Every structure is written in structure tokens, then in C-alpha cells.
């Protein structure tokens, strides 16, 4: 690594409650490299949060919203070049390229360390380096892990306070020699003496780098979301998935929900959907009219850490403490519980500002306000939008909100032992081919379903079908190691649990997005998805029927509870049918994925594909 140029070392100001000599030495090393003006150890207190928010209001990064409309809430607007995750600048720097696999960007770790050494040398000059200790998962949980992020962004500090268990209490768990994941983040915009800062500092050069063997994360150049809040995708999925591979557990891009039947029986379900497929909506589902007595509760909306428990079953926690959700499309109609969560103590990013100091985004209301300030600080009216197509909120605009504020939060959401998972659900956005719901006949077939799932990336244009992007397990951008090894890890975990006599969770594949000949969605979705969920739970109890398909088991029309919904057998046929020519084409697409991953692909997957083909020919 480049030798830092000689400067007077900054005072570390280590609080007396920090007893971890390895952590202190690491902070000292990074401070010597990045040369901040000062080092601040974050305690996670409300006073600290309020002070940093006020500092950002004064600096133009955030504005305080009308307290009568949104108590203790703020709006931040980013630089237009820094609005989303940057997959092409995200690297897995494993020692061996084949351990990253063909679906990840790999770079040689030593060369990357030299590159980052140059970029981080003096990167925090003129700024404060914040030491942000955080726990992913309830403090002290056997499933939780600790991280420490060093960042020069106060925006990161306040978001991490909502998204994780952050602050002084983490050091009590860490003690003098506890393990932690070291995370280094800089916006990459040092300030010369007397240089005026900007509202949203960032750098056109961006790197989001993971070292799986040493469990390190380094992020440079972005202040936004998953690039900068390193506990989220970087730690909770990319690094944690490699920890899970090595230690026999799973880190998954999954919501976790509880479902209680009218008789009081409670089930727990984990579900993986790629982005824009309704994960948060499903996590906060409200059962529809006609399904009285059923109750859905939210444990997590995005990430699940899943470990075998002493009882042999898989137990899951939500490692996060908040929601970092996409705002556009969220409304009282689509997600009542999310809207109720956003009434206070929220940080909004890149949404629009109303004239009375509140927020708005596309899809929040049927009729937009007559005038707004858009996410780039410009006047916006419906007429301007009609003329230019300009959105008031950025399509990836976000809210950061405390999970505890969600009306549907599950009483077990902070149980350190986690909740026992009864079923896994995998789903993508497909306008054709994939049925509304299918149950895998066994664990291997379920892993095959999840490994080959995909979503359409482009809207159908001039009758053209959307391009299907394979997104295995909804983990394509987030798996920290070779995807074939990841499939193998799932298969081995299933075998290991079966050998102990444990009951494995059932695996289901869903698709809410089949379209009819008119190009419209056939299935009503949202709360009505409860009907599909109820069928799955009936299958677990041996109470619901099903029909063998070439690809798993699906319900017949009479197996679904239609109380309160007019949905004809013809419509049901449109969403459940298996079109054999379409499936032959689908299997050819599966082959493309398997060819890409051939070097380490577990043989169970091509064998399962052959079995499907045989059933189609029968």
C-alpha cells in the first residue's frame, strides 16, 4: 500500500469504554492513511443524531421537513451522478479469480490494494472521520455479527443509526478481542484549507471493494445508499454470504414474515424477489377482504441471515434495524403499512418537496401536486412533466425508516434466536411462462427453481417480450463468491439437515406478473397474494390439494380460497398454465446460465433439468 505522506498524526480521541486494541490500531492506521482533520467515535445517541442532522441542514445536504407533516424528518438530495448502486464498480477481490466466479467483477487483491492505497491517501483531508460501530442483528444474538465503518460522511452516520444497531452498546458486545468486519468509506473529496464544501460530496471515480478472505470492505467515491451504508448489501450479503459458506449458514436477499391463521397457528416464511418485484409490499401484506382472521407480521423486508438451530431447523433473523426502501410506487393503496411507517423520524433521499414542506413521489397519490421542487432542486409541475417527461422524484429515491415504527412489525422481530422458517418463496417478474405458484417436490428441485429464476429487465416494446435477466436466488449482484459454489452450498445444507432428520422448509416459486392478451396483469396482486400464501401453508399442513406439473406442483382452481374475490377459472388458467413450447425455450435459457457456470456447477442441477425435459416428453 502507498506510504502515507508525512503529516502530524490526528488525535484519535479514543473513548475510555473502547477496550479493543486491535480496533484502535486499525483506526489509527486508517487515520494515518486518510488524514482527516479529526476523529469522532459515534455513540448512537439521539443527541448525536440531531446534531449531525442539523450540521447537514446548515451545509445544504439536507432540509428539515415540516414537523407538522413529518416529525423529525429530513430530505436529502444527492448529486445527480450519485443515485444508485454501481454494479460495474463493485469488485470481489478473492485471492483466486475462480472463487469470485463468472458473475462477479474480480480484481487481483494486491493490485486493488495498491489502487485504493493511492485513492485513500489523504482522501479525508479537511473532513471528520466518524467511527461507526454497528451490529447486524440483535446485539448479542448467536446469529448476529459486528462491523465498524470508518466514514467521512455524516449522512452515512445518521442512516446507519436507523439501519443498524449502532453506537456505544456495540463495544460492550465486542469487548477487548471480539471479531468485527472492518469497513472503510470515503466520499473521495478532500478539502484544501479554506475550500468550501459542496452539499453532496462525491467523486466520479468509484470503487466498492470486498476482500472475502479478510472480511474487509473498502468503498470510495459514492455517498449513496448501498455504496456507502456498508452494513447493507456489502456486509449483510456479499461478505456475510462468504462467512456463511465457510461456517455453514446462509445470508440471503430475502424478506421474512410471520403468518398467523384464524386458529392461532403461526408460520414463518422467507421470500426472495429481485428489485421491483414487490418485496417490501409482500413483507407488509394486509390480508384482503374475505380472509378475515389471518394476520401477517413483518420481521424483515430485504435481508435474512439463516442458521441451523439446536433443534435442527433453519432459524432466521433480520440483520437490519430499518427499511431502506424505494419510494416511487409506494402509496396507501400499494403498501399501507410502509406509508404508516414513514410518518416520523425518516430520512428521505431524492424525493420531491411540496410547497408545504412535505414529500411527494410518483405513485404516492393519483393526482400530483400542482407545484413541487424536484429532486434536483428545480421547479416541477404536471405541465412540465407532460412536456419533458421529467420525474419529480428519482426512480431510485429512497426512505430510511426505523423498523420498530412499522404497524405490522412482528413481536419476534428482535428475538436473538431468530424464527424457525417453514417455507422459502422465490419469485421474479415474468409476463409469460412461469406459473402463479409452484411447489418444489423436494429440496433439489427447489434449489433448481431458485437457481434459474429470472426477471424481465425491459418493458415490452412494440409487442416484443422483455429481456429475461437470470437472477439466481435474487442474489446475482450480491453473492460474494462463485455462484456455482453458492448453489452447492444450498444443496449441501439441505443434505446435512436431512441427515439429522430435520424437517426442511418447503420451497415455492411464484410469479405475480403474468399478462393476458391485452398486455395487462391478470393476477390482482398486493393483498390478494395472501390467497397464494394460504395455499402454501395448507400444503405444509397436508390440508391443500395440488396438481403435478412438469415443474413442481401447482394448485387447481378449487384449491385456492376465493372468498371475497371475483376471479374466474379462465383467468386462473391464464396465470397457472404451463405452455410446453414456452418451457422448451425456457430450458434452453437455463442451459445458457449453466454453460456460463459450468466450471463448478453441481451435477444435481443438470440432472434436474433432464428430469423436467423427460416429464415434458412423456
UniProtKB/Swiss-Prot annotation:
UniProt-recorded Gene Ontology molecular function terms: GTP binding; manganese ion binding; phosphoenolpyruvate carboxykinase (GTP) activity
Residues annotated to bind substrate: 85, 224-226, 275, 396-398
Catalytic activity: oxaloacetate + GTP = phosphoenolpyruvate + GDP + CO2
Gene3D superfamilies, sorted: 3.90.228.20, Phosphoenolpyruvate Carboxykinase, domain 1 (3.40.449.10), Phosphoenolpyruvate Carboxykinase, domain 2 (2.170.8.10)
PROSITE patterns per the UniProt record, alphabetical: PEPCK_GTP
Cofactor(s) for this UniProt protein: Mn(2+)
GO biological-process terms attached to the record: cellular response to glucose stimulus; gluconeogenesis; glycerol biosynthetic process from pyruvate; oxaloacetate metabolic process; propionate catabolic process; response to lipid; response to starvation
A single Gene Ontology CC term: cytosol
Enzyme class: lyase
Family of the protein in this entry: Belongs to the phosphoenolpyruvate carboxykinase [GTP] family.
Function: Catalyzes the conversion of oxaloacetate (OAA) to phosphoenolpyruvate (PEP), the rate-limiting step in the metabolic pathway that produces glucose from lactate and other precursors derived from the citric acid cycle.
Record's protein name: Phosphoenolpyruvate carboxykinase [GTP]
The species this protein was found in: Bordetella bronchiseptica (strain ATCC BAA-588 / NCTC 13252 / RB50) (Alcaligenes bronchisepticus)
